[in-house]
């Protein structure tokens, strides 16, 4: 088996490469480290190596954030000889929260030899999501965070709060019709936020899809109706904790569906997030692709924080 560690050199405040290299010093298997050079470079690299080693299993380990993992997944999909996994080095690392957190994937030697399981992907046009597609209020938060993250005072550790303030001012009412397997979820064509989930977390800490399973052949769609700013402030902590599907305060404002196809029609268009990467669209369809890719999942380390949590996804 060929093993490639695909490192985003900008991740981990520029320390991702040194971190991975040091952890691999005593590795007893052959591997190569590849440093990405531009956006979508990881996708290109994965495709090329899958074709080059067509008769051999090739494992690609994304060392960066959710964006790097997304690029690796997009390169590997469609190749029977491809396996992927990750060593999270980004800031949010939302995808691995589905498996309990980054600790489980922190040792590259363990990740390189972990068993694989088939997981689903969400297809959006010619792109794929391994985690969550989302848009509306929370995408406005993300959009602002990306703009200000390197600025003094309002950026850095304050970037999230700056994003929330911006979204509260400009992202409370969004327009677009939402269809889950043909069912219209919002007759008035308005919504606060919406997620189409394969896994469970977005935005670094929001447990947006607590019932999602990434191997059940279904998309978990959650649409929230527009509400007042005051009500949002009262409910946002419960949404962050993943309580919105059972909390009676959300009963009249949340539409939750499990579907195979989810369509959005927004004549004016807006930004959507595909695993944390923003793109502008006005009409798109998300379709589940069952068992689309082989993903390596290490066992829970008894000494890690993951061992303190219930192991739901094995």
At which residue positions do the language-model features occur?
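ATP/NTP phosphate-donor binding region
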Residues: 1-60, 70, 302, 309-314
């Amino acid at each position: 088996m060929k093993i490639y560690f695909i490192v985003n050199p900008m991740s981990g405040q520029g320390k991702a490469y040194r971190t991975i290299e040091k952890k691999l010093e005593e590795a007893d298997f052959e591997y190569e480290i590849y440093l990405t050079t531009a956006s979508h470079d990881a996708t290109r690299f994965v495709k090329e190596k899958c074709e080059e080693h067509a008769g051999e299993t090739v494992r690609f380990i994304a060392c960066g954030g959710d964006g790097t993992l997304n690029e690796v997944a997009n390169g590997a999909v469609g190749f029977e000889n491809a396996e992927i996994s990750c060593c999270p080095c980004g800031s949010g690392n939302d995808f691995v929260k589905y498996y309990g957190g980054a600790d489980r994937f922190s040792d590259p030697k363990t990740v390189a030899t972990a068993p694989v399981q088939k997981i689903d992907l969400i297809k959006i046009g010619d792109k794929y999501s391994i985690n969550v597609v989302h848009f509306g209020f929370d995408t406005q938060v993300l959009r602002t965070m990306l703009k200000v993250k390197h600025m003094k005072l309002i950026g850095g550790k304050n970037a999230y709060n700056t994003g929330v303030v911006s979204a509260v001012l400009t992202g409370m009412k969004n327009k677009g019709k939402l269809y889950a397997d043909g069912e219209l979820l919002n007759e008035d064509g308005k919504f606060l936020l919406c997620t189409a989930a394969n896994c469970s977390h977005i935005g670094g800490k929001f447990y947006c899809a607590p019932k999602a399973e990434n191997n059940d052949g279904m998309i978990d769609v959650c649409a929230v109706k527009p509400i007042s700013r005051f009500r949002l402030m009262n409910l946002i902590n419960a949404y962050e904790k993943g309580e919105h599907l059972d909390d009676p305060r959300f009963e009249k404002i949340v539409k939750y569906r499990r579907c195979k196809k989810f369509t959005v029609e927004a004549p004016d268009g807006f930004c959507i997030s595909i695993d944390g990467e923003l793109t502008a669209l006005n009409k798109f369809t998300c379709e589940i692709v069952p068992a689309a890719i082989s993903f390596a999942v290490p066992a829970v380390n008894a000494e890690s924080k993951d061992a303190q949590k219930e192991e739901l996804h094995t």
